Amino acid sequence: GVSNEEIAEILVQLMKQAVGDRPFIISGGDVGSSVARYMASQSPQALLGLHLTDVGIIRPLLKKTHSLSLEEADYQERAQTFFETETGYMEIQATKPQTLSFGISDSPVGLLAWLGEKYWAWSGKDQNGDSLLSPEDMIHLVYLYWETNCAATAANVYLENATKLLPLANLTVATGISL
């Protein structure tokens, strides 16, 4: 398998083949956010800019107990709740991805259960607490994984990142973030 850092190296080379020496802009969200940051860290001269839709959890802030602004305290509470209720998938995918992979690669219902639960939990909600993603939208998103047979590979990235990932350097590329 490959880590986000290794994926970044591959994508930079592919982009250089596609656009030559012309700098390009990248955008990433979720795991792609980490990949995009590694691309910017490894090859800043190749980029005009970086757009992120996810910056991850700011882990040091979770441990801070004093001098928090209202915004930081709110972030800390929401991030802590997320860690306590929504990160079990990370532990499974980072330690036993192959066990999971059989169920999500062999059964469309297994894949829908695994991914659909996350899409439902993480999507915005209306006033009634219903997901802003329709059931059809969720099925379409899951179908992309099913049709391309990439769910096992996507799960395995967490194991690779848990064992191979190096810390990111400070970024010098112009960066925009939309949350």
Task: Briefly describe each language-model feature range.
Residues 12-13, 22-26, 46-51, 102, ...:
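Beta-sheet entry/capping signal
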Residues 7, 65-97, 167-170:
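The feature captures the conserved acid-bearing segment of alpha/beta-hydrolase catalytic domains
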